[in-house]
Amino acid sequence: APRKFFVGGNWKMNGDKKSLGELIQTLNAAKVPFTGEIVCAPPEAYLDFARLKVDPKFGVAAQNCYKVSKGAFTGEISPAMIKDCGVTWVILGHSERRHVFGESDELIGQKVSHALSEGLGVVACIGEKLDEREAGITEGVVFEVTEVIADDVKDWSKVVLAYEPVWAIGTGKTASPQQSQELHGKLRKWLKENVSETVADSVRIIYGGSVTGATCKELASEPDVDGFLVGGASLKPEFVEYKDVRQ
């Protein structure tokens, strides 16, 4: 079966009820033939608000969660709470969580495991920084992180892998469609050799670098690029156009 195209809009720590409400209205009203899966990730404070306002045909994701269901963990939210808001996805291991907040591969693996066991879909992020890329260790870094995640996954049907070329985010550098395809292809091969052929064929590997309306068509035409995790650009109304690039 062909893999269902996946577009995630990560709103990060941006917006308020007024601006996000307007964005959601634009999203809901978009007349776009709908073949893929669109998921938007509002700030935690607006999970309820977003799920209430966003058309049910779109998914909503949290941007993070913790590795247990409840307890003395000030400032954290659990998958159970996310589900209680009617939200079905969570983004884990985003480069900002790793590099700004110091989350380790191990912690992210534990979060992935717990979120999946609670029935959430997980967008698990992996990628390498500029110094790692320049040192020629991209594959080693990316496979190592994927392995930690893979060790914690029993059921892959609810996992989307997002490759973030961290070296290209907000730096003005972009990964060419060929560079992206090469890495996505190697990731799929790694899954085939280390998990199973079935998983390798069915898991969506999406691109989490800088995406613009101009680059998304070219990227989406690559055989192993199954969608996007869009950052800042997802706060603009044109975001809705990204979801139609395969048609």
Curated annotation (Swiss-Prot):
CDD domains: TIM (cd00311). Its EC number is 5.3.1.1, 4.2.3.3. It holds the Pfam family TIM. This is Triosephosphate isomerase. Homodimer. Triosephosphate isomerase is an extremely efficient metabolic enzyme that catalyzes the interconversion between dihydroxyacetone phosphate (DHAP) and D-glyceraldehyde-3-phosphate (G3P) in glycolysis and gluconeogenesis. Pathway: Carbohydrate biosynthesis; gluconeogenesis; Carbohydrate degradation; glycolysis; D-glyceraldehyde 3-phosphate from glycerone phosphate: step 1/1. Its main location: cytoplasm. GO terms for molecular function: methylglyoxal synthase activity; triose-phosphate isomerase activity. It catalyses: D-glyceraldehyde 3-phosphate = dihydroxyacetone phosphate; dihydroxyacetone phosphate = methylglyoxal + phosphate. The active site is at 94 (electrophile), 164 (proton acceptor). Keywords: Cytoplasm, Gluconeogenesis, Glycolysis, Isomerase, Lyase. Belongs to the triosephosphate isomerase family. It comes from Latimeria chalumnae. GO terms for cellular component: cytosol. Substrate binds at residues 10, 12. The keyword Ribonucleoprotein does not apply. PANTHER family: TRIOSEPHOSPHATE ISOMERASE.
